[in-house]
Every structure is written in C-alpha cells, then in structure tokens.
C-alpha cells in the first residue's frame, strides 16, 4: 500500500516563509549561511511554490510581531487563494512574536524562564493580548474538524492538544 508523506493539513503560526522584502534575515542566515545567493533564497520562499496540490492551511499571526512580519502570512494566504488551496488566515491586532498557546500559564512560565525579557509595561501589554491571541487554538480546532471531517465522537480538545504539543517540545 502506498503512503503519502503529504500532510492532510498545516497549522502555521508566525511563519518564516518568505525570502523577499519581508524575510526574517536572521532565520535565512541560520538556514543558508552567509554565502547564500538570491536564487537559494528565492527557492525557499514558500509563497512562490504554492500549487493546488498543497494541503489546506490554517495560518495565524499578530500585527505587532517585530520578529517576523505579518506580510509573510499575507503573501502566503494570497498565494493559497490564487492556487485554490483551502485556507484560514487570522491576524490579531496585538501580541508579540512567539505567544505560542497564549495562555496565562504559558506567559507565567515564560516570565519564570526569562524574568528580565519584558518591561512591566510590555508584560501588561502581553497579558492584555492573551485573550484575543489565545482564540487561535479554538479557531484551529474548528478549522481542523471541518477540514479533516472529524466526527463529534472523535472530539479534539484543542487547548489540551495544542498545550500538550507545546509542553512536549514538539512545537520547536
């Protein structure tokens, strides 16, 4: 029996997927090294390789992300639209890069790991964004159920699934 390596769906958060004007320079430097040329970077610009064969995609980002421009997501979503690939694209107004599951528990853990990373004002701002950004897990659950035709008896607890993925380190 043949088995496909193609995923049935993708969930992308803060994706570094464009090598053009909006690329994250540090990511491409780490990936390709200092001697990469434009052709290599172009090859890794995912939005330029979207075809109708691409699996459905759930994409989320925050406009305030100073690490990875939300334009990465806009470019990819537009490429999906043009290719006829089913997708959901959610952009939240507030929130820093890497908010992961965006729960208070997650943020408390981050504060323990790196207490000096954010000023009190930045901490308050992130706390304020948790409710909105944290919606992505529920949105992803509904999207997955619809996209993968998951029956009610196969209920996925989205917060638990995504939290367990985060806790296990599989998100890295």
What are these regions (language model features)?
Residues 6-9, 54-57, 83-88:
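Loop/turn elements at helix/coil->beta-strand transitions in domains of secreted/extracellular proteins
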Residues 1-27, 37, 41-42, 160:
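Primarily recognizes the serine-hydrolase "nucleophile elbow" in alpha/beta-hydrolase
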Residues 34-49, 53-55:
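Active-site nucleophile elbow and catalytic-triad environment of alpha/beta-hydrolase enzymes
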Residues 74-172:
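C-terminal catalytic histidine-bearing segment of alpha/beta-hydrolase fold enzymes
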Residues 53, 58-61, 65:
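Short beta-strand/loop motif that positions the catalytic acidic residue
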Residues 11-14, 60, 92-93:
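Alpha/beta-hydrolase-fold catalytic nucleophile elbow
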Residues 22-25, 70, 101-102:
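Short, solvent-exposed loop/turn and secondary-structure capping segments
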Residues 19, 64-68:
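Acidic catalytic loop of the alpha/beta-hydrolase fold
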């Amino acid at each position: 029996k043949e088995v496909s390596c193609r995923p049935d769906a993708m969930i992308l958060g803060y994706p570094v997927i464009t090598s053009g004007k909006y690329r994250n320079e540090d990511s491409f430097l780490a990936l390709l090294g200092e001697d990469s040329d434009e052709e290599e970077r172009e090859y890794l610009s995912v939005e330029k390789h979207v075809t109708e064969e691409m699996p459905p995609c759930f994409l989320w980002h925050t406009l305030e992300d100073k690490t990875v421009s939300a334009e990465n997501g806009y470019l990819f979503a537009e490429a999906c639209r043009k290719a006829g690939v089913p997708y959901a694209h959610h952009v939240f107004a507030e929130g820093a890069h890497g908010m992961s599951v965006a729960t208070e528990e997650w943020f408390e853990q981050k504060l323990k790991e790196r207490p000096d990373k954010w000023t009190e004002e930045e901490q308050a701002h992130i706390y304020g964004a948790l409710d909105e950004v944290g919606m992505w897990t529920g949105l992803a659950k509904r999207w997955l159920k619809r996209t993968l035709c998951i029956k009610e008896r196969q209920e996925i607890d989205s917060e638990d699934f995504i939290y367990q993925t985060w806790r296990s380190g599989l998100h890295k």
